[in-house]
Design a protein with these regions (language model features):
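Catalytic domains of riboflavin
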Residues: 1-167
Length: 167
């Protein structure tokens, strides 16, 4: 990855530092928003979002994505430091068709939510590179899951989850 932009940005959640990274293998752009500072080796509140930055129409139609983002930013603002990484996934037509088919099943079950965008295993490597650039190796993982998921591959990237924080 290559860091292409690095500047402070005013958001509805306050001032954050925005970094944009270009993935050289496929020209995808990933975004990191950070607040505050930390020392090397310090555990940092972190959320890693897999998203389709340019085209998540299903999420827009069915989810309250703003509510989820509000909760994530609120948590980071509470502790006055943290990172939110947006891993941008390439939109492929067949994957979109698969998500539409899954949406149909969810709707038939009365669920008003979009199917999750599944994180590609390659995304862990990209996320790890971004985290290392941010000098984050110990993570307090922001998650909306009630049961912590084992992230087996993270140790191989020199990352450690020290805690799971619900938002």
């Amino acid at each position: 990855i290559q860091k292409k932009e690095d500047f402070d940005i005013q958001t509805r959640f306050g001032t954050f530092r925005m970094r944009a990274y270009l993935q050289t293998t496929n020209k995808q752009v990933h975004i990191a928003l950070t607040k505050g500072t930390w020392n090397a080796g310090e555990s940092v509140l972190t959320r890693i979002n897999t998203t389709q930055v340019n085209n998540d129409i299903l999420g827009t139609l069915t989810d309250n994505n703003d509510k989820k983002l509000d909760d994530i930013f609120r948590k980071i603002n509470e502790v006055e430091k943290g990172a939110i990484i947006f891993i941008n996934q390439e939109v492929k037509s067949l994957e979109l068709l698969d998500r539409i088919a899954e949406l149909k099943v969810l709707q038939s079950q009365g669920e008003m939510r979009a199917p999750q965008i599944k994180m590609d295993t390659k995304d862990f490597g990209i996320g790890a590179q971004i985290l290392h650039d941010l000098d984050i190796t110990k993570i307090e993982l922001l998650s909306n899951s009630t049961a912590p998921t084992k992230r087996v591959g993270m140790i191989g990237y020199g990352l450690e989850i020290t805690d799971y924080v619900n938002y």
